[in-house]
C-alpha cells in the first residue's frame, strides 16, 4: 500500500560559545514508503570545540541513529547526552541533523567476534598487524600504511588505502570518509550481546555496526581502528575473513590520537565505495531475523 508522505529535513546547529541557535527547515513530498513500513529517519550528531569541524575546530563527539518517528525524542536526547559527556571535552558547537530515509534499507548480519588480550600498545599493534595479514593484506603494504598513520590520524573520518598502489585514494584530506546511515536496533543488539557474552554498551554496538557495514562492501578487505577517545584504549581489526577482532590495548590512556583505515583491493570505484559508506542506509540484524 502506498501513500503520500511528507518527508522532513531539518538541521539544528547550536553554537554554545555565542549562545546562538540556528534552525534551517525544508520539506519535500515523496510518494509511497518502503514496503508499507513506518517512515525511518537518520539522526546524526557532531560536536566540536572552538569552531565547527570544517573551520578547524577540535572534534569532540559524533553519533547517529536510524529510527522511526516515535523514537526521535529518545534518539535526540541520547545524542545530546553523548555530545556533552565525552572525555575529549565540552563542545561549544553541536549540530544535530534529521532527514527522512526514502530508499530501501539494506540489512547486514553482525560479524563473528573475538577478543585478544594485550597489556601494551606495542603488543596490541603487533596483533593488529598479524590479523591484517590473515585478512589478506601483504606485510609490506601494512607497514606502508603504518608509516603514514600520524598523517591519517588528522582526518576526521576514515582513510581509504589501496593495497595495490600503496597509497591513500579517497582524496578527502582532513575530512576523510564518514561511515553513516546505519544502526543496530537495540532489542536485536541486546540479544546478540547476551548470546556472545558481550557487554551491552553503546560503544561496542556503534563500533560493530560500522565494522559490519564497512566489511559488507565487496572492495574493502579489512578495517583497522582505534578511538581518539583518551579514555578508551581498545581497538579492532575487522574483515570478512576474520570478523570483528577486538584488541584490548592499542594505545596508552590519555592519548587523543585515533585511527581508521579501510584497506581496499585496488579494484573499487572510489566514489561508488564512498557513496555506499556514507549514504546507503543499513540495519545490522542477526541471521535468524533476516
UniProtKB/Swiss-Prot annotation:
Recorded catalytic activity of this chain's protein: heptanedioate + ATP + CoA = 6-carboxyhexanoyl-CoA + AMP + diphosphate
The protein's name: 6-carboxyhexanoate--CoA ligase
Quaternary state and interactors: Homodimer.
Keywords: ATP-binding, Biotin biosynthesis, Ligase, Magnesium, Nucleotide-binding
Cofactor(s) listed: Mg(2+)
Keyword ATP-binding: yes
Entry-linked Pfam families: BioW
EC id: 6.2.1.14
Superkingdom: Bacteria
The keyword Phosphoprotein is annotated on this UniProt entry: no
The protein's role, per its UniProt record: Catalyzes the transformation of pimelate into pimeloyl-CoA with concomitant hydrolysis of ATP to AMP.
Enzyme class: ligase
Pathway, per record: Metabolic intermediate metabolism; pimeloyl-CoA biosynthesis; pimeloyl-CoA from pimelate: step 1/1
Matches recorded under HAMAP family: BioW
Molecular function terms from GO: 6-carboxyhexanoate-CoA ligase activity; ATP binding; magnesium ion binding
One record GO biological process: biotin biosynthetic process
Family label: Belongs to the BioW family.
Originating organism: Bacillus amyloliquefaciens (Bacillus velezensis)
Amino acid at each position: 500500500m502506498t501513500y503520500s508522505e511528507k518527508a522532513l529535513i531539518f538541521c539544528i546547529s547550536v553554537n554554545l560559545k555565542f549562545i546562538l541557535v540556528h534552525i534551517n527547515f525544508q520539506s519535500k513530498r515523496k510518494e509511497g514508503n518502503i514496503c508499507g513500513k513506518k517512515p525511518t529517519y537518520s539522526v546524526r550528531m557532531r560536536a566540536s570545540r572552538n569552531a565547527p569541524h570544517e573551520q578547524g575546530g577540535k572534534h569532540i563527539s559524533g553519533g547517529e541513529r536510524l529510527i522511526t518517528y516515535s523514537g526521535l525524542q529518545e534518539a535526540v536526547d541520547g545524542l545530546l547526552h553523548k555530545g556533552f559527556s565525552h572525555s575529549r571535552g565540552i563542545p561549544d558547537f553541536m549540530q544535530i541533523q534529521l532527514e527522512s530515509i526514502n530508499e530501501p534499507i539494506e540489512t547486514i548480519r553482525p560479524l563473528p567476534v573475538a577478543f585478544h588480550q594485550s597489556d601494551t600498545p606495542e603488543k596490541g599493534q603487533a596483533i593488529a598487524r598479524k590479523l591484517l595479514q590473515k585478512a589478506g593484506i601483504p606485510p609490506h603494504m601494512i607497514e606502508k600504511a603504518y608509516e603514514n598513520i600520524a598523517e591519517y590520524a588528522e582526518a576526521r573520518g576514515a582513510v581509504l588505502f589501496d593495497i595495490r598502489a600503496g597509497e591513500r585514494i579517497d582524496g578527502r584530506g582532513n575530512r576523510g570518509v564518514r561511515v553513516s546511515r546505519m544502526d543496530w536496533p537495540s532489542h536485536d543488539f541486546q540479544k546478540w550481546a547476551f548470546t556472545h557474552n558481550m557487554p551491552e554498551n553503546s560503544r561496542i554496538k556503534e563500533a560493530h555496526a560500522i565494522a559490519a557495514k564497512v566489511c559488507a562492501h565487496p572492495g574493502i578487505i579489512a578495517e583497522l581502528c582505534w578511538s581518539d577517545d583518551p579514555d578508551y584504549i581498545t581497538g579492532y581489526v575487522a574483515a570478512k575473513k576474520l570478523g570483528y577482532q577486538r584488541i584490548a590495548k592499542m594505545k596508552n590512556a590519555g592519548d587523543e590520537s585515533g585511527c581508521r583505515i579501510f584497506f581496499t583491493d585496488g579494484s573499487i570505484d572510489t566514489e561508488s565505495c564512498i557513496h555506499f559508506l556514507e549514504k546507503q542506509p543499513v540495519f545490522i540484524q542477526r541471521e535468524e531475523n533476516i
